[in-house]
């Protein structure tokens, strides 16, 4: 059986985080890592917990960057919600920024429903 190839998309926020990166070489390395997510994304990285349950994280560009994503099985889709440096304890830490963006997206979604 032919392996399934997932489509990898970035949320607007993840795309913006990627575009704001200054180092083009690091961007290229991140793109190469994103490309690998097309094949068996569920076997890559690690499952996250607590506020990010349902998401996975992989390391990129050595150990400095994290790509945070969610797999949508029924659509054969990988949705990247966060890209950035791991800076534990820093407000710009990729996990901190991603959680803030996800909360903002939920609040926007709720206000659209009203």
Residue ranges of model-derived segments:
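Amphipathic alpha-helical interface surfaces
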Residues: 26, 30-33, 44, 48, ...
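A short, surface-exposed loop/turn module that caps and links secondary-structure elements
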Residues: 35-60
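Generic secondary-structure transition motif, activating predominantly at the C-termini of alpha-helices
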Residues: 22-25, 38, 52, 56, ...
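Short, charged helix-to-loop "capping" segments that act as catalytic/coupling loops
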Residues: 19-27, 50-52, 60-65, 85-89
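Charged/polar, solvent-exposed surface patches and flexible loops
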Residues: 16, 20, 32, 36, ...
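Enriched for short, Lys/Arg-rich terminal
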Residues: 7, 62-65, 70-114
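Arg/Lys-rich, positively charged N-terminal/basic patches that mediate binding to nucleic acids
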Residues: 1-33, 107-114
């Amino acid at each position: 059986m032919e392996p399934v190839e997932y489509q990898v998309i970035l949320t607007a926020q993840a795309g913006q985080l990627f575009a704001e990166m200054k180092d083009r070489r690091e961007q290229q390395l991140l793109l190469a890592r994103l490309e690998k997510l097309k094949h068996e994304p569920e076997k890559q990285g690690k499952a996250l917990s607590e506020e990010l349950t349902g998401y996975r994280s992989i390391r990129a560009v050595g150990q400095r960057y994290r790509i945070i994503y969610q797999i949508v099985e029924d659509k054969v889709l990988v949705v990247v919600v966060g890209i950035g440096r791991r800076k534990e304890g820093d407000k710009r830490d990729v996990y901190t920024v991603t959680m803030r963006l996800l909360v903002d997206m939920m609040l926007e979604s709720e206000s659209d429903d009203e």
